Amino acid sequence: MRVSTAQFYYQNSLNMSLKSSDLNEQSPFLSSGKRVLTAKDDSVSYGKLSGYKNDISQIEQFNRNIIQSKNHNVLTETSFALTQDTMLQVKQHFIQANNSALTDDDRQSIADQMKQYLSQILDVANSKDESGGYIFSGHKIDKQPFALQADNSVIYQGDSGVDQLSIGNNVFVNINQPGDSAFEKIPNAIGDFTPSYTTNVGGATVTRAVVDDRGSYDTVTHPPGYTLDFTDTDLNGQLEVVVTDANTNAITTIDPFVPGQAFSFNGVEVTIEGTPAVGDQFVLNEDEEVSIFETIKAAIDWLELGGNAANSSQHEIDYGHILSQINRATSYVSAQQGLAGISLQLIESQESRHLDTNLSLEQGRSSIEDLDFASAVSRFEQSELALQAAQQTFSRLQGLSLFNYL
């Protein structure tokens, strides 16, 4: 069949163009090392691949959150460990201070040391993270949470905000403990009230004062603090307790009063050890929680009062209350440290799980996406040879004419 010159050029150009196009299409796969780049390469595999990549991306986000939450909880746990160590020193020195052989100068020296401990815990409570934010200020990370006042009291300037991060599907972890819950919400060792002893000639002690019946606890009709007056109206040597509220309204009279035996009024249960004297008066002020700073301040005030206490018996009673609260504060700090430790255990568990899951996902992704280099290179070389052969054939045929046969 006779082939025109134009047809010859067209057919050969088309052949080389197709082979060149085939070669060019293979280049991106080789350069990227991927078998599937777009949906048109393999629509089914591309869909599966998208699922794998989304899951891997989500784990990467979880892992970023894990790093952040781990850093914060490690810092929190360390802060509580330092605080607990300091509180143990506070307890040790306060026990040493209860020695009649000590002079006022000795007690003042211990009080000065207590002030150093207060400063140390305050520094811990005002700790910052790696980005410069206060870790115990709640959501007010730019606001110093605790401020020392001239009288050694401490005020909280943060809020109660708690932040969480997602570290797994439906798994969230706290990354902070606000300062009020960390250092101020320590349960009162006596219960829900703190006693003050207006007169305590008999040397009795309030050992327990709790709201044991919330339904009967009426703070509108009978607001706290509650005054307990010890009387003997019958002059029979048997004490009664006249209970009045903050407005001096009478609530009830406990008759007879029995030392060590609990009595109740307005939903409140009270136990008093020892025998009060007629005319003694105690006041129960509502105080469910006591901050760690209040406790250390109380210890400092007790020490600085020294031998000048008007009532040495009452001074010893106050000592017992303060020591009990020091013990309660130390235990509370240990529990808060434990909460940070539990968070770290959860974080580490999720981190390990993500490592296993990510390995499985990467294997699945690789089986779909990654290129078989040996096969791809072989195919590329074959296509390259085919193109070269077509080019050489065209070049040789292009140089032929009728004169070559004469």
Region spans (language model):
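Amphipathic alpha-helical polymerization modules
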Residues: M1-D151, V173, D301-L406
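Cysteine-poor, low-complexity segments in flexible/peripheral regions
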Residues: Q144-N311
